[in-house]
Design a protein with these regions (language model features):
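Concave beta-strand-loop units of leucine-rich repeat
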Residues: 1-18, 28-40, 44, 50-69, ...
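Acidic, Mg2+-coordinating catalytic modules of nucleic-acid enzymes
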Residues: 289
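Conserved alpha/beta core surface patches that mediate binding of polyanionic ligands
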Residues: 360
């Protein structure tokens, strides 16, 4: 007279469990786990009327399995089915009126559930996780009034969300079409959710969304993530005014339309710890972010031609920031970063930058990844990298623009990835690579410069595995790569630009060599 039984996943080389007829003699069984099995015949389960929990997660069901024997398990409280199961008739589950939790566990590349009508009588179900496929209707969900969490994932095209309106207990809503283009929720606004005032999390993929109208009264929201199945160009959200009263928000992610210019509704969301905005929006400064002092993550990504920012003073008060991803076009100064000493990752993307020094970075000693926006080819003044000298935690550095000197990099021995595109023109004084000789931990390096023809210091960077050299000029081509014979860990080498290499024996040990 046991209450639980567990058939675990078989060890490699053994056969999976396929026969569960023995459990028919366990009428008092309350908990049964058949994870990783290959059971196809469920009839032995039909008499287990005391069963409360049944798990098939990660079971191997390559063909449709008859779920009819489960219909008699009316005391069943929780059921997990394998996510990778073959398309199966789920209607027998409609008899499990005491079910509070239903999930499809394990990995699934393709969802297949296209009909939800069998859910209409499951008014006790509390949590629902379903892999769907080409789902076009939510009909059936209106009866699952006890739901607090709904998670539908897979290809879907939903134009009518009204079945959700009756789910007054819903706290967490996830509708994600796995990036299916033109899929997800296809609606202009979110008025269908306006009565779901207990919602704390919304995570949906929405196409055609123009306004957030409908969420203004959802004041319990702590997380709002709205994705777009296409790229930036397809986003259509241009009205975010409804956000201003959602002061409990901690996480916010949006894809916005190209013609949106007013981000002031974000300024009052002072509890935000994570903010992500993507789109081809227009922006001339980030001052509307100045009061969001609880932010740990900030992502504002778009087209740098539409985002023309002179400096970063708009974010200077965000001293708790750890991750910063900003698109900045025509950036003239890094001023504004000086006091953001908790930063570990900085990604400043964009073009036409003209900043000439990195002094604002000198106190950011926790930074591990640093990418600076591309300086324009027409910027004559070389950039001083001295501000990096104390950034000894730096592991990855990406820079494009004319460089004054590489000397500030000499002490950055934690570096693993280095990408330098020196945009100085041919004829200017040679760029000395000797500061790189101490960077023996660098494994991947890209170096481009017309004023480099002596690469001998690179031969001391013995940790290198991948090396791209786009160096040399018409007057001073790259000829000698003998120093590279010391790079015994090197597996890939490319030499491009102006090269006149006649002796390739120094890289004979390298598996992949390309010399243009």
């Amino acid at each position: 007279k046991g209450t639980g039984a567990h058939a675990a996943s078989p060890q490699e080389g053994n056969n999976a469990v396929t026969d569960i007829s023995a459990v028919a003699n366990m009428p008092y069984l309350e908990n049964l786990r058949l994870r990783g099995t290959s059971v196809q015949d469920l009839s032995p389960l039909s008499g287990l009327e005391e069963l409360r929990e049944l798990q098939f997660g990660d079971a191997v069901w390559d063909t449709a399995v008859d779920l009819t024997p489960l219909a008699t398990l009316t005391n069943l409280d929780y059921l997990s089915l394998p996510a990778s199961m073959a398309p199966t008739d789920l209607s027998p589950l409609g008899e499990l009126t005491n079910l509070t939790g239903l999930s499809f566990d394990g990995s699934s590349n393709n969802g297949w559930i296209t009909d939800l009508t069998w859910l209409s009588d499951l008014n006790q179900i509390d949590q629902l996780y379903l892999p769907v496929g080409e789902l076009t209707s939510l009909k059936g969900l209106e009866g699952a009034t006890a739901l607090t969490e709904l998670n539908l994932y897979g290809p879907m095209y939903l134009t009518d969300l009204t079945p959700l309106a009756s789910l007054k207990n819903l706290q967490r809503l996830y509708l994600y079409s796995n990036g299916t283009s033109g899929g997800g929720v296809v609606t202009k606004d979110l008025t269908c959710l306006s009565s779901l005032t207990r919602l704390s999390e919304i995570n949906i993929e929405a196409d055609g969304l123009e306004s957030l109208r409908g969420i203004e009264n959802l004041t319990e929201l702590t997380s709002l993530r709205i994705y777009n199945s296409g790229n930036y160009d397809t986003a259509s959200l241009r009205d975010i005014s409804q956000l201003q009263n959602l002061t409990k928000l901690k996480e916010l992610q949006l894809y916005v339309a190209a013609d949106i210019q007013d981000f002031s509704p974000l300024s009052g969301l002072t509890g935000l710890t994570s903010l992500q905005v993507n789109g081809n929006f227009i922006c001339s400064d980030y001052s509307f972010l100045s009061g969001l002092t609880e932010l740990r993550e900030l992502y504002f990504n778009g087209d740098s031609q539409n985002i023309r920012i002179k400096d970063l003073t708009g974010i200077q008060n965000l001293t708790k920031l750890q991750t910063l991803h900003l698109t900045v076009g025509a950036l003239e100064s890094l001023h504004g970063l000086e006091n953001l000493t908790e930063l570990t990752d900085i990604y400043l993307t964009g073009s036409d930058a003209s900043f000439t020094d990195t002094a604002p970075l000198q106190n950011l000693t926790k930074v591990k990844t640093l990418r600076l926006p591309n300086r324009g080819y027409d910027v004559e003044t070389a950039c001083d990298l001295s501000g990096l000298a104390r950034m000894t935690s730096l592991q990855e550095f990406n820079f494009s623009g004319k460089i004054k000197s590489l000397a500030p990099l000499a002490g950055l021995t934690s570096l693993r990835v280095l990408d330098i595109n020196d945009q100085a023109r041919d004829g200017e004084p040679a760029l000395d690579l000797s500061p790189l000789a101490s960077l023996k931990g660098v494994t991947d390096m890209t170096l481009q410069s017309q004023r480099v023809s002596d690469v001998s210091p690179v031969g001391q960077m013995t940790g290198l595995r991948t090396l791209y050299l786009g160096v040399g000029s018409y007057e001073h081509p790259l000829r000698d790569i003998s120093a590279l014979s010391n790079l015994t860990n090197l597996s890939s080498f490319t030499a491009s630009g102006w090269t006149e290499i006649t002796d390739t024996s120094p890289v004979a040990h390298v598996a992949n060599v390309t010399i243009n």
